[in-house]
């Protein structure tokens, strides 16, 4: 099967078309802007898979309709999914703009005095607004000299933020969400909304019953050699934790081995269903070898599977991590309980950062008073205003233990292409695998147990669907916090000490849902959330605007908010602008 090519970024150098001196004097400067933009993006950005982002520059500067059409023909043949138009001068607005309504687009107008790049920028954006094709504006804060070929820091920030979000849009388009199973325990996010995926994300939904997973396991529709490798890897790296089950529910060594084997097989088969596996074709299983072109998936599990078969915790935790028995690799996106909306938040975070995502229940708000009452100790530092306990039954990416280290030696979660094998091993060493609690999971399983290191910046997100409004996005930037061991042990034991825990302190603003930690918890729109490494809420906001998903809750600084220029025409309050603009333009892939 031919591998699908990655989307590219097209660079469109536009120019004043008047000959006899004007165009000729601008050719080199204009094309150099395009080359500098392409060089910046190719140097600084990677796709979520780790490949360098490739830029395609128009063959000539664009002065009018003919050259614009020639550029479009080139871009169409090279899978350009995002465009950036650059110019240092006046050009002919509507004659030179990118008119593709589905492609994210930005215009960088050079801030110089010799030629009016800013005037073209304003004229072109006016044309975009009038035609209903939103575009992002890039204009440097400070005037540059005409021969200054550098890219100012503020321009670079906008170029890269736009490019990251635009590539996420282009990368999701045409892919599928694999819904493995149906609705889990009445969780609304697992009532998979096909229209949402099709109209807002440009994706399809592949619905597959869990009996297909059972068939693949029972009929050995997998690579049997790889299974042996996976078992040997687990034998080497898995540390087993406390079994809290009553004696009558504890499994012996043979039974536990069978549960481990099936859990690893689930990981292999779900992966194969998502992306395919040529090894299956070698066994004569050509149809199964193709997979479903899924960029994200969800597994229902509870309860129709888990009441008799091992749960999905081990499979999901390993798939969501940046490593397994094959070494370090790109993490998959697999949502627990088939919560497709949390899966979309995971997908957004992965596409923007290239990192693994931590799926969690937004479980408990612990106030300072409650913590002191229960433990006899006060919360201090970033935790002083209270904390949110993020914990689920063990499907969180193991990267979430934060045993990886950044350049300064701080705990973090790296993009998979930066992870060393010893860092992957450290994440495994920090994880215990605890037998699943029988009352929850009658078919057994193993839950990963780890504690996220403190002081790590995170962004928590969630997509919700509101009837009559459509999808909305929630964003809460904050930090993981480290509690004294005795305090952690007491609080953790009140929920389930065999599950992975992150203690999260959102950054407070003193206003609205971020007036205090309680309000963050109270305003969260569902029982699940996603942790993405870093304070990357601004990137989520830009991506959401491209998809026409309004942001209903965030604590991102106003100076970092970057949306299409037309949003400014939808009122003076920036959050109201977002709602009105998203309603006005409708979903990106209108249905």
Curated annotation (Swiss-Prot):
Q: Which GO terms describe its biological process?
A: D-arabinose catabolic process; L-fucose catabolic process
Among its keywords, does the record have Cytoplasm?
yes
Pfam families noted in UniProt: Fucose_iso_C, Fucose_iso_N1, Fucose_iso_N2
Its pathway is: Carbohydrate degradation; L-fucose degradation; L-lactaldehyde and glycerone phosphate from L-fucose: step 1/3
Q: Which cofactor does it need?
A: Mn(2+)
Q: Which domain of life is it from?
A: Bacteria
Q: Which SUPFAM superfamilies match?
A: FucI/AraA C-terminal domain-like, FucI/AraA N-terminal and middle domains
- Indicate the transmembrane segments per the record: none
Mind naming one GO cellular-component term on file for this protein? Answer: cytoplasm
Could you say which residues bind Mn(2+) here? 337, 361, 528
What Gene3D superfamilies does UniProt report for this protein, alphabetically?
3.40.50.1070, L-fucose Isomerase, Chain A, domain 2, L-fucose/L-arabinose isomerase, C-terminal
Q: Where in the cell is it found?
A: Cytoplasm
Supply the EC number(s).
5.3.1.25
State any single GO MF term: manganese ion binding
Active-site residues (renumbered): 337 (proton acceptor), 361 (proton acceptor)
The reaction(s) catalysed by this protein are: L-fucose = L-fuculose
Which UniProt keywords are given for this protein, alphabetically ordered? Carbohydrate metabolism, Cytoplasm, Fucose metabolism, Isomerase, Manganese, Metal-binding
Family membership: Belongs to the L-fucose isomerase family.
Subunit details for this protein? Homohexamer.
User: Its function?
Assistant: Converts the aldose L-fucose into the corresponding ketose L-fuculose.
What is the name of the protein in this document?
L-fucose isomerase
Natural source organism = Klebsiella pneumoniae (strain 342)
Q: Source gene?
A: fucI
